[in-house]
Amino acid sequence: MRMQWIWKSRRSLQNVFIRRSSQYHKPFWRRPLPATLLGCAVLGVAAVYFAKPSPIDENYPRSVAKYLHEALYRQKGENNHDFQDAWKAYQSAIKQAESEKMDMESPPVQGIRLQMANLLASAGALHKAWSMYWDILERTSKLPDFLEQRVLIASKLIELSEPLGLQKDATKAADLIVKALLSKQFNGDDEQKSRLFEQSATLYFQAGTPSYAVPLYHEALNLTMANPSCHGLILMNNLATSLLAQTETVDKKHHETLMKQSQSWSQKAVDSYYFAYPKDRNQECHAGCAAAFYTLGQIAERQGNIDLALKHYKNSEALRKDDPYNDGSMLSHIAIDRLDKDAFIKKLDKSSSPTD
């Protein structure tokens, strides 16, 4: 009898199993239990996220924090009213911090002033931003916990020095960066350190001290070796250019050595360009190789080998097809015109000279 009942009930049992198995073929969100668990997890994460106070609320009294939240919100705007409102909110935050008896030389308060300087820079008030960055740098000189921010402020000063024409004044900022990097006090990654070394080296070069730039470009290049890129070609040529520039400031007996070193680095940049797969050569690769060919042309010209100089200049100019507006190709084009004119004038002088 029992077997007969099971046989008669087989259809209903099959339906039960089919319904259960069909649950596992439904999309995840249509399964009752997993969807419920996922919803609870999302709500839990959201609750933890929104319950956790922001760094502003942790580091500032509530009366100061409210102005900072407003300032940061306004700072995201794009019109003048947003900048003005953000500036007023920062000023109110500073006044409120003073009334709350906060130490006005402490990192939190200097952090507010740093945001104000950033706002000035983004609004185009470069001279005011420059002055404020310097003031913060001087006020924080004895704050050990503010070193990384000081390095980044110094980097910002170097960035502003070029449009303001104040490269020589910014060398103190570069000194600070180099000291922090060489003493291993700055904890950025290799890419960030390389960028800071390069930025400082470029400033020293622009300020007329290429001998300071050479070791810094070398440090910047070494930090890129673990992950080679086309930017390495730019650094190699910067090294070559700095070595060549030293011939203008040192005794003539050192000129040949400096030119050989410069030639070696320029040739390394060219070799690296042709070693890379064509598909991997980006705009930086083309610009770096063009600049390296131009430097090789300069060296050959100074050595009196005009034919070789023209060859290098033409190789540089040929890279305009890949990057039409790179500096090396354009300078090479000017150099070719100059050498062609010189050759033409010499030819005229020869033909017009009296013969016996």
Swiss-Prot record:
Subcellular location: Mitochondrion
Domain of life of the organism encoding this protein: Eukaryota
Keywords from the UniProt entry: Mitochondrion, Repeat, TPR repeat, Transit peptide
Annotated GO MF terms: enzyme-substrate adaptor activity; misfolded protein binding
Record-linked InterPro entries: Mrg3-like, TPR-like_helical_dom_sf, TPR_rpt
Gene3D superfamilies found in the cross-reference section: Tetratricopeptide repeat domain (1.25.40.10)
GO biological process: mitochondrial protein catabolic process; mitochondrial protein quality control; protein quality control for misfolded or incompletely synthesized proteins
Protein name as catalogued: TPR repeat-containing protein P27G11.02
Source taxonomy: Eukaryota, Fungi, Dikarya, Ascomycota, Taphrinomycotina
